[in-house]
A protein has these predicted regions:
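A polyanion-binding, active-site-adjacent surface
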Residues: 1-110, 117
Length: 117
């Protein structure tokens, strides 16, 4: 059975790669990163001045951020869970190795790790 997750938005030459811990089931169901209403990513992005005009959460906006603003998206662990606390230590170890290879391969100018405790 194929694991449900979100696709990476990675390519050479990105200005920023936003790295989440892992996709939530909510985001996977909706098909885009940071999909949960009230996610702090969107107000922070809009306040940053990186995108003008302000954007609202959607799959199309994720693609716009990738194509127009050279902002990519990936996760430390690709296994979707209701909460990041449900990840096992093995998910983090495996994810760190894979993420390191992605960052070396795509070499973004900035890699931004996003996590909430």
């Amino acid at each position: 059975m194929k694991q449900r997750t979100l696709p990476d938005f990675l390519a050479p030459g990105l200005d920023i790669v936003s790295i989440g811990i892992n996709p939530s089931l909510y985001s996977v169901e909706r098909g885009f990163y940071f999909a949960r209403p009230g996610n702090r990513f969107w107000p922070a992005l809009n306040a940053s001045g990186l995108v003008v005009p302000a954007v609202a959460p959607s799959r199309d906006v994720i693609e716009l951020l990738f194509r127009k603003y050279h902002i990519g998206f990936t996760d430390l662990a690709k296994r979707a869970t209701p909460r990041a606390a449900e990840l096992a230590d093995a998910d983090y170890r495996r994810g760190a190795r894979v993420l390191q290879k992605k960052l070396v391969r795509y070499a973004p100018a900035i890699a931004c790790c996003l996590a909430v405790r």
